[in-house]
Amino acid sequence: MCDAFVGTWKLVSSENFDDYMKEVGVGFATRKVAGMAKPNMIISVNGDVITIRSESTFKNTEISFKLGQEFDEVTADDRKVKSIITLDGGVLVQVQKWDGKSTTIKRKREDDKLVVECVMKGVTSTRVYERA
């Protein structure tokens, strides 16, 4: 199921993340601090519950969920969103909705990397992780 995602991943490259955060509505100061952070992502599976934990000097966040079931999430920039995550062709697809807005976050394996693509309206950010 999601075994290919399990493990500890470290951020190695980030493209367009500031523009993405700006489109989401993240304030200037938070964008600057978050943009400099180099988070580790720890993904684990326990039965049918998947946990994604992000650890950085900026903030630690954790979500635990079952595929296809909506859940409440407080994001690293303190947005309160409704999220749903599905597995589509080997890609974890997360949709966050809040205040009439939505953003899509896709997590996929490419070779030995984990690629995270964040899309809000016409702005796309790509963040690449390698095993830690």
Swiss-Prot record:
Subcellular location: Cytoplasm; Nucleus
Modified residues (Phosphotyrosine): 20
Any single Pfam family the record assigns to this protein: Lipocalin
Keywords annotated in UniProt: Acetylation, Cytoplasm, Hibernation, Lipid-binding, Nucleus, Phosphoprotein, Transport
GO cellular component, one term: cytoplasm
Induction profile: Up-regulated during hibernation in brown adipose tissue.
Free-text note regarding domains: Forms a beta-barrel structure that accommodates the hydrophobic ligand in its interior.
This protein's name: Fatty acid-binding protein, adipocyte
Organism per entry: Ictidomys tridecemlineatus
Taxon lineage: Eukaryota, Metazoa, Chordata, Craniata, Vertebrata
Gene name for this UniProt entry: FABP4
